[in-house]
Structure formats: C-alpha cells, structure tokens
C-alpha cells in the first residue's frame, strides 16, 4: 500500500488581538456579543465558533421534532421579544437567533469553523493566547485577548453518551444516538425502540409515532414531565389589547418566572404535593387503568433532575392512541431482532435509538495553561459560578438547571460588562478570583450538590468540575431567583477579586 505524506497545516504567524474573545456562537455567545455591544461598545471582540454556522445545540441536533424543553419567553433573551408559541421548534429558535444577529450586525464578529485547541495565559503579557484550528482553510492560527468569555455550552457535540450493552453488534438494524442522527434514516412503517425517557425521548416519540409501525419508550426508571398547553393566555389577551410586543414579552416572562418559582418552591418544601401536581395531568390523559406508578412516578424527588415541558401532552396522547407505548425494565442484551429484557420479555425492533443522554465538556475541553502550568479545573474553586480561582481574566456562562439557560446568559452578560468597566475605572488589566484569608478554611463542596440535582451527565463528570465553597462569593447558587438580586449588586471590591 502506498502512503501519501500529508504536510502539516501551516501556522499563520500574525496573531490577531482583541479586548474580549467569546468562545461559541450559540445562544450564550450571541447573548454575550449583544451585551458587549450594548454596554461596552469601546471593546473590540471576536466570536470563535467551531461549527459551520451559529446556533450551537440548535445547529447540531437534527433528530425529528427537536424543540425547546423550556418556554421561549424565558429561554429567549430579555432584550428580544418572543412572539411565537411558548415551546418552539429548532427551526423557530434558529430563526430567532438569526434575527438577533441580523438586527445587530453580529455576523461580522463571528469566525466559523475555528476550533480552539489550547489557551495559554501569560502574566508577563497580561493576555490569553489561543491556538486555533481552521477547518475552512486547514490552517493553524493564533488569537490573543485580554479577556476570555467562555460561552461554549456544556454538551460534547461530537457524540452522545451511549452505554455498552452485550450483543449490540448482533442487532441487524441501525442503532442511532439522536446526537448523531443520520439524514437518511427511514423509520416509516418500522418498529422502533427508544432507549431512555428524558427530554430527547419525549421529543422524538411524538414526532416519529405517526409514521412508525409502533414506537416503544424503554426506560430503566421513570422521569418527571411537565404537561402544559402550548399557548399563553396572558400573552394572547395582551395582544388582543394591542399591547406592544416588548411589554408582552416582559409581562409574560415575569408571570412565568413567578409561577415557575412557586412550583420550584413547592417541590422543595412539599415534594409529595408537587409530585401529585405533576402526575395529575398524566392520569387525566391516560386514565385510571394505566399503570402510572410503574411508568411515570420516579423514585427521586421533583426537581432533583430537570423536568421537561411536554406541550399539549403530546407524548401521552401518542401513548393513549396506541401509536406509542412505555416499557419500564432493564436491558439484558441486544439480539439480532431487538432487545432481551431482564424480566425475560423481548422487544422486537427494526431500529433502536439510544436516547441515553450526553457527555459534558469542561470549559470546551480546551487545554488551558496558566503561566506555563497546565490547568486542572477540578482543583479550582468557583467565584459565583462564573469565574475560577487562579484563572485570570476569564468568565464562563453556565446556565440554570431548574430554569431556562438563557436567564443566566443575561445576568452574566451584565456582570461581565460591569466588571470590565470597573477594571477600566481602577486602571487595571487583570482580575483573578483569589481566596481571602477568611476563606482558607471553608468547606469545599461539589460544583452541584448531588442530593439537590443529580442527572447522569452531571454525575459522570462531577469529579472533573470546579468545586464551590460554603459561603459567598464562592457558592455556585444555580438559582435564578437568588442571583437576579445578588449579581447586579455584587461587591467587586470585597477582596475576592485580585486586581493587577
């Protein structure tokens, strides 16, 4: 066999420098760019995105029925009114983001097909230098920035999480993870088994059910769901009164946050009552004869895992119609024609879909180095869930688990812009979270308390994530209702941020 030598891509010698470098052009990165333009227009910035276009998750997820599992009044930005149905499809969300980009001319700041492979901080130079691979030109290039704003999200987009089961290689049909959905998959008239019962499964099944011979959701244990109509009465009433869309958006947003906050508090204070509130509409659809206890009453408490909204109860309508069914059991092994369960039952299938979750990335899985020393984020302590001890001039957007992700995009956008302005006022160029003397002996805790929130993707990565302290400002509150009051007035001169 003749092997062809491939010459390594050349490294471009010119290093482009910016005041701020935003990583990712998904909903977080686009939001960050907006806040910079609006609040710190004097700052130069660039957005580096590894994909072919903007959108992040909404670009990479291509499976049938892809939609939000949060309402768009709160998942959308506070500055861009949402005018559609509360739960939106992937295409509607991409269109919404495109409108933001067009309205603010953000396209000129975004560099697509730029994958960051390394980020090195130099205290001598007081800047980050990033090594970047360009897929469009097959070049390796470099950028430098005074401040790094990580908006990469927490999915590993390359592939999803699929456990290994005995006999998978024996199955004659395709085994597909939704995160790697093939465009040519034909499921019309086929028997389909979806392994998993999270938000992805709850989206796939009602979208596919009308075309399949039958579709089965196979789950090891039940999941909580939140059934809601895909309309908003308050929004409809306000629009009938010709209230401006900006007002409609803000009023409905506040009402949803109020209602959702009450439900969350109910779940924390009276979990049994919250459980019944979640199960009642399922019983109303499926009837008293359906085994709700086995298939839809989880072993964990409400809100220990994220709860997906099911618009119009479409998943359960499919079950009631007979197009879909649920099996609660464990997999013994795959067979040539389906799955053998530990109960001894078999599920015949032409296609098996492993909707078994995703793997988290840690700060984009980028190799970080600070003054020549490789950075282990698991050894850092978070400052307010957005910066990290010993890591200069960097902030990360990590959204909420119990509320819409984008609520924190806006809060962190305000905070970072306020911090950048404060640094200008002080005449400094470096800010680093640093433990004060009184913090040295504080108890260190996981990034998220597993007793409070424990989905599989988080449990698999918890040892790789930064830790939090038992006091402010070292807590990762992950609570919108707390942070909307605390972050805007957080003291930037309390000694926890060291300026140079």
State each model region's role:
Residues 2-25, 31-52, 57, 89-191, ...:
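Flavin (primarily FAD) cofactor-binding/catalytic cores of flavoenzymes
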Residues 50, 55-99, 222-284, 288-289:
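Glycine-rich active-site loop/strand segments that organize a redox cofactor
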Residues 68, 77, 165-168, 296, ...:
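Short clusters of hydrophobic/aromatic residues that line enzyme substrate/ligand-binding pockets
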Residues 69-71, 362, 388, 451:
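A short, structural micro-pattern
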Residues 73, 292-299, 470-474:
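Short coil/turn segments at secondary-structure boundaries
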Residues 201, 224-227, 381-382, 393-500:
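C-terminal, flexible cofactor-proximal segment of oxidoreductases
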Residues 259-269, 300-304, 433-443:
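Charged, low-complexity surface segments at secondary-structure and domain boundaries
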